[in-house]
Structures are given as C-alpha cells and as structure tokens.
Amino acid sequence: MNVRKPLLSALLAASLMSATAGGGLAAVSPSQQGHAGTGAAIAELTLNDGQKWPSDAALREGMTEIRAIMRASLGQIHGGNYSAAEYAALADRMESQVDGLVRNCRLPPEADAQLHLVIADILDGAEMMRKDNGRIEGAIKLMRTLHAYGDYFDHPDWHTVAN
C-alpha cells in the first residue's frame, strides 16, 4: 500500500493539472470530437450553435456545491489519505447534490439533454469512488466533469477546481 500511495498521488496530480490547465484537456474541449478515454458522455457534449447552454439558479447552486465539496476533499485525496468510507461518503454527497439539482433545475429541453450527460458522468464518478479499484479514477472523472461543465454551460464566475 505504501508504494501505491505515491503512484496514486502522482496520477491524481497529473490528471488534476490537466483538467484545470487551459487547453490541456482536449477530450472535454468544446471543439473536440470523439472519445478520448474520459467518459463517452463528456465527449458527446455539444455547444448550442457555438454558445454555452443556459443555466438556471438551481443548476448553478447545485454545481457550485458539487465543486465546493470536491475542492474541500482534494487535499486528502491528493495525499492518498482518503479512506474507503470517506470516498463512499463523498459519493453519497455527490449523489445527494445531483438529486436536488434534478429535482429543482428547469432548463429548456435541449439544454436539459446536455445536462443529463454531465449528470451521468457525475454519477458514474461517484459510483467509481465506491469501488476498491476505482476510487482515484472516480475523483479524476468528477474533476474532469466539472471542467467540462464550465466549457459547455453558461455559469457566471465558474472556475474549475485547482489542485
């Protein structure tokens, strides 16, 4: 386990750096087509005739909270100090935020369809964090999804999480 922690920390650091660096994450860039291993849903996101999709207050509030939860968890995740129980609790919090977001968000149908792709990746990342062999990958997927959300949805003052 001691050998694994530095490897996981390095992997997370590299992934987070690429997810937060401008232009470093081609798989979630609005101009990118296809699938590059970060999750098919993110690769399928499209812009609204070259513009970001609209958001509403419920969406912005929910995504801001998801970002805050991830930001608060990054130090321990990056340090390899998150336990299985903590990852499960983090996954629960992601799912709870998604539940509230879905319940209260009211977007036009086309924007809602795009949001469902983002939600699918958030839930997939949360599920990955529950598995013994996918926790760090789940956290990385969530970080990349937050980055993609900002690329495709009009959310004033949206900033991706920096590591």
State the predicted function of each range.
Residues 55-62, 66, 83, 87-90, ...:
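Amphipathic alpha-helix face/heptad-repeat signature
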Residues 10-19:
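Bacterial N-terminal signal peptides
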Residues 97-116:
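Short, solvent-exposed, charged loop/turn and helix-capping segments
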Residues 22-26:
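Sec/Tat signal peptide C-region and signal peptidase I cleavage site
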Residues 70, 85-103:
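Short N-proximal segments of mature Sec-exported proteins
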Residues 2-11:
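Bacterial N-terminal signal peptides that target proteins for export
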Residues 27-82, 161:
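Immediate post-signal-peptide N-terminus of mature secreted/exported proteins
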Residues 104, 115-163:
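Helix-rich interaction surfaces within compact, conserved domain-sized segments
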